[in-house]
């Protein structure tokens, strides 16, 4: 199983119907030490496996965007969690870490450029943490940065709004579950800064693959991102 598992919350903490045992109790019974925040992790002496959840998120599925937090309610940042994971796993035995900046995708689904930039910035902090580790262990470390897809079809230096046929927009009704007000706000901010979007969903646009370290040459050129697994395992 996993030795170190951290995230912004647990989906269906008590099952889909809400009638099951708390999942943290189940995890602890299976041998994991559940820590609410990196502060609790620092006092943990469990070497068989830990699960780290933000201190304020015991029964929440996800954090708000970092930029929306109050100054006195900041949660552990992605880079800090990655640094804790590296320290927990140590450098005596080989390890593999998958670290995801998932809020980048969420913000792009909303065409929310402000929060997407903030999420990318925090992901970049995590990449810097990984790169610092690579500098200390250059002959035995491989770092890969990529994405499973692009979202939103973002274009910089586009969309000044002149193509919108405002006179042709007809009055209509909104679905009860669609927050069009928020989406329109996000689009307005993007338009004001000459940023264009093509969709609120995933696109088929190519995504970059960056690699540094041992075996990085295997990731040069164009490859299908589903081939990454095989290249890593072969390494």
Language model regions located:
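A post-motif C-terminal structural segment
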Residues: 1-235
